[in-house]
Regions:
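Short C-terminal tail/terminal secondary-structure segment
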Residues: 52, 132, 143-157
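Alpha-helical segment proximal to the catalytic Tyr-Lys
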Residues: 32, 76-80, 140
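Active-site loop-to-helix junction immediately N-terminal to the catalytic Tyr of the SDR YXXXK motif
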Residues: 49, 53-61, 73, 100
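A glycine/serine/threonine-rich, flexible loop-to-helix segment
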Residues: 80, 92-116, 156-157
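Short, small-residue-biased leader/transition segments that mark boundaries at the very start
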Residues: 2-7
């Protein structure tokens, strides 16, 4: 993370390439198969940062917002062919990587946690229900949506 006025081009390119370009071309590749079959479900990974913002996160916030918008855009193209595309947008989730990051930046972790109304960070298992729902026939009439699994993070603004 860096302030927008000093963000390095190579860091910007890495963030946007990984998240936007990577997601787009994954959709394109799997979409070829699904379009042939006439059915499929794609669940893209967004973030609460695609809806809200924070200092020194502009490229990441932009990329995650772009994923949600891209999912909506492609869903309008492929829905007539039976393809549903949605975005799952989690909040801060406890992983080996995030634990190390939060330990090295405790004030940052505290700030994020203060925005999660359920009072704790998510665990990967917290995202399972939404992912299973989006992958199941229970969501057959849902496309182009973003599901926030965030413990109230986005509700707080």
């Amino acid at each position: 993370s860096a302030a927008s006025d000093v963000y390095k081009r190579q860091d910007f390119d890495l963030i946007t390439s990984t998240h936007l370009r990577g997601t787009f071309f994954c959709c394109q590749k799997i979409g070829e198969i699904m379009l042939e079959r006439g059915y499929g479900k794609i669940i893209n990974l967004g973030s609460t940062w695609g809806y809200t913002t924070d200092a020194k996160k502009a490229p990441y916030c932009m990329a995650k917002a772009g994923i949600a918008h891209m999912s909506r855009a492609i869903s309008t193209e492929w829905a007539p062919n039976g393809i549903r595309i949605n975005t799952l947008a989690p909040t801060g989730t406890v992983t080996e990587f995030t634990q190390k990051t939060w330990e090295s930046m405790p004030e940052r972790a505290k700030g994020i946690l203060s925005r999660i109304k359920l009072g704790r960070f998510a665990y990967p298992s917290d995202h399972l229900g939404a992912a299973i729902f989006l992958a199941s026939s229970a969501s057959d009439f849902i496309t182009g949506q973003t599901i926030y699994v965030d413990g109230g993070f986005t509700a707080a603004g």
